[in-house]
Amino acid sequence: MIGCAAEKELIARLESLELAPFRFHGWLGNRKTQSFGWRYDFDDASFARTDPIPHWLESVRGAAAAFGGLDPGDLVHVLLARYDPGAGIGWHRDRDVFDQVVGISLATPARLRFRQRTEDGGFRRASVDVEPRSGYRLSGSARWDWEHSIAPGDQLRFSITFRTLSDKGRRIAKQTCGTVRQRNG
């Protein structure tokens, strides 16, 4: 999705940020993150506008939108993440204030795992290896019917994940600030 030079520049930018440990109901995760545009707080289940998406992410937002067949302006949330060796993400579905997800993996490969509950109580499983500089899109059934996780890696990895707002997210956004579309000029 992006070239080597762009990846190096993005990693340098990400390493210069003060990313915070991921918080989930009072627990601290092994990965470090920062949200722009919108932020979902897992400690109190709040959803609010936060700092605007930085200008230096505009070209990668454009690439993510082109990859996902989306308008760049619809990608109103971005989550930057650093995964030190041993860090992964447990099984989950993204919160319902978000809809489509376009992620980009940087530095090292990641295994994106999927599972869907079956009628007999078990799981149907699949996985995809996401190479550095490549992307993935979660929409439709993959987004809403399957859970996903990222296996812990043994090397430093970064990710940039863009999201659109769902109908619910847009309703909440309109109630709180009157607009949902963010354009950086």
Model-derived features with residue positions:
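Non-heme Fe(II) oxygenase metal-center motifs and adjacent flexible, charged/small-residue loops
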Residues: 1-185
